[in-house]
Amino acid sequence: MAKKVPLGIRGQAEETVEHKHTLNHHHDKLPAIYSTPNMIGLMEWAAANAMLPFLDEGEISVGTAINVEHRAPTTIGDLVKTEAVLESHNERFYIFRVTAHNGKAEIGRGTVTRAIVNPAKVAERHAKR
Protein backbone atom coordinates (compact mmCIF):
# COMPACT_ATOMS: atom_id res chain seq x y z
CA MET A 1 0.00 0.00 0.00
CA ALA A 2 1.72 3.11 -1.24
CA LYS A 3 -1.06 5.65 -0.64
CA LYS A 4 -1.61 7.10 2.83
CA VAL A 5 -5.20 6.66 3.99
CA PRO A 6 -6.40 9.93 5.58
CA LEU A 7 -8.69 10.05 8.58
CA GLY A 8 -12.21 11.15 7.74
CA ILE A 9 -12.55 9.34 4.41
CA ARG A 10 -16.15 8.28 3.79
CA GLY A 11 -17.86 5.48 1.97
CA GLN A 12 -21.50 4.69 1.36
CA ALA A 13 -23.59 1.69 0.40
CA GLU A 14 -27.33 1.24 0.05
CA GLU A 15 -29.94 -1.37 -0.76
CA THR A 16 -33.70 -1.64 -0.93
CA VAL A 17 -34.94 -4.28 1.50
CA GLU A 18 -36.26 -7.38 -0.25
CA HIS A 19 -37.54 -10.60 1.28
CA LYS A 20 -34.07 -12.16 0.88
CA HIS A 21 -32.73 -9.51 3.33
CA THR A 22 -35.21 -10.38 6.09
CA LEU A 23 -35.27 -12.67 9.10
CA ASN A 24 -38.27 -14.46 7.59
CA HIS A 25 -36.16 -15.54 4.62
CA HIS A 26 -34.07 -17.63 7.00
CA HIS A 27 -36.87 -18.92 9.21
CA ASP A 28 -40.60 -18.79 8.52
CA LYS A 29 -41.45 -18.19 12.19
CA LEU A 30 -39.54 -14.88 12.23
CA PRO A 31 -40.90 -11.52 11.01
CA ALA A 32 -40.18 -10.09 7.57
CA ILE A 33 -37.88 -7.33 8.85
CA TYR A 34 -34.35 -6.40 7.81
CA SER A 35 -31.82 -8.75 9.37
CA THR A 36 -28.83 -7.70 11.43
CA PRO A 37 -26.39 -9.73 9.27
CA ASN A 38 -27.57 -7.87 6.16
CA MET A 39 -27.20 -4.50 7.89
CA ILE A 40 -23.67 -5.40 9.01
CA GLY A 41 -22.79 -6.55 5.50
CA LEU A 42 -23.95 -3.24 4.07
CA MET A 43 -21.91 -1.36 6.68
CA GLU A 44 -18.87 -3.42 5.68
CA TRP A 45 -19.44 -2.49 2.02
CA ALA A 46 -19.58 1.20 2.94
CA ALA A 47 -16.19 0.89 4.67
CA ALA A 48 -14.77 -1.14 1.77
CA ASN A 49 -15.96 1.52 -0.68
CA ALA A 50 -14.15 4.21 1.34
CA MET A 51 -10.89 2.28 1.05
CA LEU A 52 -11.06 1.49 -2.68
CA PRO A 53 -9.18 4.60 -3.92
CA PHE A 54 -6.26 3.81 -1.60
CA LEU A 55 -5.64 0.18 -2.59
CA ASP A 56 -2.75 -0.81 -4.80
CA GLU A 57 -3.11 -3.29 -7.65
CA GLY A 58 -3.79 -6.74 -6.24
CA GLU A 59 -4.92 -5.50 -2.82
CA ILE A 60 -8.32 -5.76 -1.18
CA SER A 61 -9.65 -4.76 2.22
CA VAL A 62 -11.24 -7.35 4.47
CA GLY A 63 -13.32 -7.09 7.61
CA THR A 64 -11.58 -8.14 10.82
CA ALA A 65 -13.92 -6.98 13.62
CA ILE A 66 -17.41 -5.58 14.16
CA ASN A 67 -19.14 -3.90 17.09
CA VAL A 68 -22.61 -2.89 15.94
CA GLU A 69 -26.04 -2.24 17.46
CA HIS A 70 -29.21 -2.89 15.43
CA ARG A 71 -31.55 -0.27 16.92
CA ALA A 72 -34.77 -0.20 14.87
CA PRO A 73 -36.73 -2.42 12.46
CA THR A 74 -36.93 -1.87 8.72
CA THR A 75 -39.48 -3.45 6.41
CA ILE A 76 -39.54 -4.72 2.83
CA GLY A 77 -39.42 -1.86 0.32
CA ASP A 78 -37.51 0.54 2.57
CA LEU A 79 -34.18 1.94 1.36
CA VAL A 80 -31.31 1.37 3.78
CA LYS A 81 -28.32 3.71 3.46
CA THR A 82 -25.07 3.15 5.31
CA GLU A 83 -22.09 5.41 5.79
CA ALA A 84 -18.61 4.64 7.09
CA VAL A 85 -16.13 7.28 8.29
CA LEU A 86 -12.51 6.38 9.05
CA GLU A 87 -11.84 7.35 12.67
CA SER A 88 -8.45 5.78 13.34
CA HIS A 89 -5.84 3.43 11.95
CA ASN A 90 -2.44 2.00 12.64
CA GLU A 91 -0.10 0.19 10.28
CA ARG A 92 -2.49 -2.74 9.95
CA PHE A 93 -6.07 -1.94 10.99
CA TYR A 94 -8.57 0.73 9.88
CA ILE A 95 -11.45 1.50 12.25
CA PHE A 96 -14.61 3.01 10.77
CA ARG A 97 -17.57 4.58 12.57
CA VAL A 98 -20.63 3.21 10.75
CA THR A 99 -24.29 4.19 10.68
CA ALA A 100 -27.38 2.86 8.91
CA HIS A 101 -30.60 4.78 8.19
CA ASN A 102 -33.90 3.73 6.62
CA GLY A 103 -35.20 7.21 5.73
CA LYS A 104 -37.19 7.41 8.96
CA ALA A 105 -34.62 6.70 11.65
CA GLU A 106 -31.12 5.56 12.40
CA ILE A 107 -31.43 1.78 12.47
CA GLY A 108 -27.87 0.86 13.37
CA ARG A 109 -24.50 2.19 14.45
CA GLY A 110 -21.13 1.02 15.64
CA THR A 111 -17.67 0.30 14.31
CA VAL A 112 -16.14 -2.00 11.75
CA THR A 113 -12.44 -2.72 11.42
CA ARG A 114 -10.75 -3.58 8.14
CA ALA A 115 -7.27 -4.62 7.05
CA ILE A 116 -5.59 -4.44 3.66
CA VAL A 117 -4.38 -7.75 2.25
CA ASN A 118 -3.08 -9.21 -0.97
CA PRO A 119 -5.26 -12.27 -1.73
CA ALA A 120 -2.45 -14.01 -3.63
CA LYS A 121 -0.11 -13.69 -0.64
CA VAL A 122 -2.82 -14.90 1.74
CA ALA A 123 -3.44 -17.96 -0.45
CA GLU A 124 0.30 -18.63 -0.62
CA ARG A 125 0.63 -18.51 3.18
CA HIS A 126 -2.44 -20.70 3.58
CA ALA A 127 -1.05 -23.31 1.17
CA LYS A 128 2.08 -23.62 3.34
CA ARG A 129 0.06 -24.62 6.42
Predicted feature locations:
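HotDog/MaoC-like acyl-thioester-processing domains
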Residues: 75-76, 85-129
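Short, residue-level hotspots on alpha-helical faces of the histone-fold
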Residues: 41-45, 49
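Catalytic strand-loop segment that frames the active site of acyl-thioester-processing enzymes
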Residues: 2-35
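Intrinsically disordered, low-complexity boundary segments flanking structured domains
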Residues: 1-5, 52-55
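Hydrophobic beta-strand-centered segment that forms part of the acyl-chain substrate-binding groove
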Residues: 49-81
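Generic structural detector for well-ordered beta-strands
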Residues: 12-18, 69, 111-113
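Conserved N-terminal beta-strand and adjoining loop/helix that marks the start
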Residues: 36-40
